[in-house]
Amino acid sequence: MIALALGAAPVAAQPAADGQSWETPMAAGDRAYQQGRYAEAERFFAAALERAERLGAQDPRVALSLGLLAAAYQAEGQYAQAEPLLRRALTIAEGALGPDHPEVAATLTALGALGAAQGRYAQAEPLLRRALAIDERVLGPEHPEVAATLDALAALERLQGRYGDAELRSRRALAIREKVLGPDHVDVAASLTGLAALYRIQSRYVETEQLAQRALAVREKALGPEHPEVIAPLVILGELHAEQGRFAQAESPARRALAVAEKALGPAHPEAAAALDVLAGLARTRGRYAEAEALGRRALAIREKALGAEHPDVATTLAGLAELSALRQNAAQAEPLARRALAIQEKTLGSEHPDVARSLRALGEAQRLQNKYAEAEPAYQRALAIDEKRLGRESPRVALDLGSLGTLYRLQSRYAQAEPLYRRAQAIGEKVLGPEHPQVAATIVELASLYRAQSRFAQAEPLYQWALTLQRKALGPDHPEVALSLEEYAALLKQINREAEAAEMEGQARAIRAKAAAPAR
């Protein structure tokens, strides 16, 4: 934690009032914190603060105690309790040590990191920039505290969608830490985790996996397999494998992240919600819609309570629930979820963030399901423009946007506009995700349906067959997407008077849907 840097500053040993030592609870709190026992650390730091205040309200040790107590609160997800402590610590440190002291910078970094966690990005940035300027001037450009502030600023820029800036800072922080601290230091793992999170967003999957696995190994070795610090790389690995279509591999790290979070931090902690959100997305992709909704609703409740109703993480969960509702053909539920997510994101992230594009795509899906084509088209087009600009023209998210827009055009009989969009979506998916990815299969189904609408039956049939092969392999034979493809293929067979085969396909689709609707045993 950034705030722990406060505790590293040398303080002359001096017995507190009544012969009680301030250093004793500080050291005990530091040990508990490093071991991930944050509630215990909180109690020790509170005791240290009480003893420090006996030395005088403006004593630098009061600022140190406040900073560490705030770090414990933040680790516990109690952001509202942490902020006033850090602001008081900053006032004391500036008054006692001057505005350019490293302890002032450490407190500024802690405040900035807290602001980022709270979704208050505009407030966080100037704090972090001031901290970085102090650290570089006073400590030198290769000091570990410079790396800590660089990492905090990179995390903020990543959350804001400023990926180029974030990468430069993350790489610099990693280089400093590896040089000064060694490759197996836990602070190196923090830089690795931040860089892995960035690369996952950019679909740089090979680099993401290497960095996340290395971060996890460092933290497991240094801290143990059940320390809260292992949660973040596990969540990244779960997200990564899910996006790659490696669903069995995705579930294990995501479930482990949830178990660690619930045990170490409690079931209502934001870290638990992050793991739940990954599991909800995984269940949604695998066609386990009831499970996905339960997980998503639980994540939403945690995030709304812990972070507030307008936090960007709340919007992320809302967007996932909107996507789920659209998959279940529940447009009336999907649209308000997508609109609420979009409103939060435009307010907190700006109008051109990739998360805004995701909510726009979900909104477009809801509108398309309601035959509100004139409203859906600008939503899809805006999502595509954002993703191309912020993520690049070959991002898998761009492929999703293209496919959605292509389907809208197909439903409007705008076939000449639809086909190149599908073709481009397919090419992106095959290149970035691989030719057997479920997203590629879904695009092939849509392309086949386009050909069917144009009576290009000889071209459509092998595409349906190919897509079904891919979907059964990747998703399993009983997935709702398989049922949908069977129904589309059956419609083609009817059009070419192969009624018996069509009936067989429809029967298979009905069996899948009946099985999915049956209560779990």
Regions found by a protein language model. Give the residues of each.
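Intrinsic-disorder-linked linear interaction elements in eukaryotic regulatory proteins
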Residues: 1-521
